[in-house]
Amino acid sequence: MELSRVLDNEVKLRNAIYLLMSIVNDTAVPRNIRRAATEALNYLRDERYTPGVRAANAVGVLDQVSQDPNMPLSARTKVWQVIAILETIHD
């Protein structure tokens, strides 16, 4: 049972990383939002912490930037998708 949860968390992290990479590579997204997405990516890739801690750190960054009124709707939707994925990751 433990192995399936670990694998499930890894799949969720990969999906979140993929969505964040699409935000980082989108030049239509303002620089401060791309910077926050990069910071969230760095948290997700930091192997020193458990998946739950990495996800919580990334959610903190993304939640703050999701309130930005200059964020394009497509990027906001992706940020919300990432937050929804990351909130399901537990240790």
Swiss-Prot record:
Belongs to the UPF0147 family. This is UPF0147 protein DKAM_0139. Transmembrane segments: none annotated. Pfam families: UPF0147 (PF03685). HAMAP family: UPF0147. Signal peptide: none annotated.
